[in-house]
């Protein structure tokens, strides 16, 4: 895809195994069989009825197309705090506003490969958020379908493998379920447990050496 002349490519923050930032790279270039470790986030959005927004990834996504997953995922840009990245991405992808953003799994990371070899490899802190409206108008290039469901039904269905979801969502559900049946009461984790790359403002000029 050719970007407009005034639009910069979306970047991701590359990391080492210690969670430190080592550089940046265009998002469009990093997903392959040897995807480098990079910083991301996952967010689980709940409405006023405490229902979870579950989304189906668009069919032309590079990674796990057409698969059910959590509400939203994304990558912070260099110098962008995670909460601001979540607000931005939720609005871009779902056309809703994420409020009351809370860190719940600060140390989550995963590596998973599709049958074609394309791999995800992320330091991916997990957040919960609230949305005051149930009306969603997603970007169809990102999300092909969506539904609000009860959290207990969702995690029980995922754990029983009655509902097949993305590999990161599957692993996250196993860690979120013990936090309690009421997502609004999940304990908030300390930000100091985040990867260092997520706690440090990264110079936007940082390049891969």
UniProtKB/Swiss-Prot annotation:
Protein EC: 5.3.3.2
Domain (Nudix hydrolase) ranges: 36-171
Cofactor: binding comment: Binds 1 Mg(2+) ion per subunit. The magnesium ion binds only when substrate is bound.
Cofactor dependency: Mg(2+); Mn(2+)
Biological or metabolic pathway of the protein: Isoprenoid biosynthesis; dimethylallyl diphosphate biosynthesis; dimethylallyl diphosphate from isopentenyl diphosphate: step 1/1
Binding residues for Mn(2+): 31, 38, 75, 120, 122
GO cellular component terms, semicolon-separated: cytoplasm
Residues of the active site: 73, 122
Stated family: Belongs to the IPP isomerase type 1 family.
Name of the protein described by the UniProt record: Isopentenyl-diphosphate Delta-isomerase
Organism (species): Rhizobium rhizogenes
Gene name linked to the record: idi
């Amino acid at each position: 895809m050719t970007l407009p002349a005034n639009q910069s490519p979306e970047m991701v923050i590359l990391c080492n195994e210690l969670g430190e930032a080592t550089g940046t790279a265009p998002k469009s270039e990093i997903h392959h069989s040897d995807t480098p470790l990079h910083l991301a986030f996952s967010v689980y959005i709940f409405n006023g009825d405490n229902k979870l927004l579950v989304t189906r990834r668009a069919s032309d996504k590079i990674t796990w197309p057409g698969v059910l997953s959590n509400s939203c995922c994304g990558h912070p840009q260099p110098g962008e705090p995670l909460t601001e990245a979540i607000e931005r991405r939720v609005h871009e992808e779902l056309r809703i506003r994420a409020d009351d953003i809370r860190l719940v799994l600060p140390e989550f990371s995963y590596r998973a490969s599709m049958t074609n070899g394309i791999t995800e490899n992320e330091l991916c802190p997990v957040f919960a958020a609230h949305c005051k409206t149930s009306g969603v108008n997603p970007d169809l290039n990102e999300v092909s379908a969506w539904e609000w469901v009860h959290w207990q039904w969702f995690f029980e269905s995922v754990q029983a493998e009655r509902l097949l979801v993305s590999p990161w969502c599957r692993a996250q559900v196993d860690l979120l379920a013990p936090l309690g049946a009421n997502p609004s009461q999940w304990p908030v984790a300390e930000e100091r447990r985040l990867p260092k790359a997520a706690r440090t403002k990264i110079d936007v000029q940082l390049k891969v050496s």
